[in-house]
């Protein structure tokens, strides 16, 4: 019929019935997608730029094989490769703080989508994605695990399952104010794998929201390796480098 227009796709219908807006300021999303920031808020994010350190995924422009922080850690990191999306500063720092401490779990999904957009070309091939778990006491207080939400968004984009294969069996308290040695000691025996048959010989992408020294990810990766994982790669949305 001559009066018919072009077909309306799902995104256009969503725009009609549920107007999309930047989850931070309410402005117009950069590309009209759900979970997307506006142009101004995106400008406040510092995306990590290569070359990248293979040990932690952070920026590394020196002539050495890894960044000084990873070299000083020696063989304490238990993973096979690392990817990071953002520097822990500016808008990403604000988003993570609001997510974790102001009860806004939806922001973790925003971060997950942005992180995939930033690092999709660096993500390794994996059989599944595993979020770093919270201890039940912290989960009870916060009500959600931000790393789980980030991992779920990566799962959607990468087309591989997100599986809860790790359990945090020991409460470790706050890590943020501890030095490297204290962090490592604090995390000893903190993680376990309840069913090793789900891990054996699989390549796993281990996901956390922030990496500082890498102690939490190292302890979690070690538990997966001991349970028989073929390879463990780590992904953090934000990298806090001390150099």
Where are these regions (language model features)?
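Glycine-rich phosphate/pyrophosphate-handling loop used in enzymes and phosphotransfer proteins
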Residues: 1-207, 212-243
């Amino acid at each position: 019929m001559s009066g018919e227009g072009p077909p309306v796709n799902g995104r256009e219908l969503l725009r009609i019935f549920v107007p999309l807006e930047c989850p931070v300021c309410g402005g117009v999303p950069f590309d009209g997608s759900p979970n997307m920031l506006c142009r101004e808020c995106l400008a406040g994010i510092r995306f990590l730029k290569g070359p990248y350190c293979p040990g932690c995924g952070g920026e590394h422009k020196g002539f050495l094989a890894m960044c000084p922080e990873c070299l000083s850690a020696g063989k304490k990191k238990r993973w096979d490769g690392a990817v990071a999306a953002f520097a822990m500063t500016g808008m990403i720092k604000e988003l993570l703080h609001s997510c974790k401490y102001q009860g806004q779990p939806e922001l973790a999904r925003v971060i997950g989508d942005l992180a995939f957009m930033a690092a999709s070309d660096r993500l390794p091939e994996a059989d599944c994605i595993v979020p770093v778990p919270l201890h039940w006491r912290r989960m009870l207080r916060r009500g959600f695990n931000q790393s789980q939400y980030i991992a779920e968004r990566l799962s959607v984009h990468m087309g591989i399952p997100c599986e809860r294969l790790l359990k945090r069996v020991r409460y470790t308290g706050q890590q943020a104010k501890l030095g490297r040695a204290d962090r490592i000691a604090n995390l000893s025996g903190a993680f376990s794998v309840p069913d090793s048959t789900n891990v054996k010989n699989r390549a796993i992408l281990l996901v956390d929201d922030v990496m500082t020294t890498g102690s939490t990810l190292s302890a979690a990766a070690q538990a997966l390796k001991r349970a028989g994982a073929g390879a463990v790669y780590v992904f953090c949305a934000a990298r806090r480098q001390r150099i």
